[in-house]
Design a protein with these regions (language model features):
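Metal-dependent polysaccharide deacetylase catalytic core of the NodB/CE4 family, i.e.
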Residues: 1-58, 92-93
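Active-site-adjacent pocket scaffolds in enzyme catalytic domains
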Residues: 1-12, 16-17, 62-115
Length: 115
């Protein structure tokens, strides 16, 4: 996401209550394309993994991102993922975030359940 990293009327890139579906899709597509352009203009390949701001995702966002060529998405739920040969298992993956100020050792102990 380029500009959907704040709480306010919208939580991350979730569709607002009562928001027109077409308007929402346009907003998410344009925001995502802005990021893609910035990255490719820097000579880097376009990302194929989308990381949801605040982990806030929906069926609408998953459908749109798949149509844009994304091969996986990451939420914020801290969990271990099971990856299979089914490409759909790569969507709404969990992840572990290491907060600023936490040592790598402490972080890994927590992530591995040794805390």
């Amino acid at each position: 996401s380029w500009n959907l990293h704040e709480y306010g009327e919208r939580r991350g890139c979730l569709r607002r209550r009562g928001e027109d579906e077409t308007r929402y899709e346009t907003l998410l597509r344009e925001d995502t394309e802005q990021t893609q352009t910035l990255i490719t203009d820097a000579g880097l390949p376009a990302p194929t993994c989308y990381t949801y701001p605040f982990g806030a995702c929906s069926k609408e966002s998953e459908t749109l991102l798949k149509s844009m060529g994304f091969r996986c998405t990451l939420g914020c739920e801290e969990r271990i993922n099971t990856v299979t040969r089914n490409p759909d298992c790569l969507f709404e993956l969990g992840r572990f975030n290491r907060p600023a100020g936490q040592s790598t050792e402490s972080y890994l102990h927590r992530a591995l359940g040794e805390d």
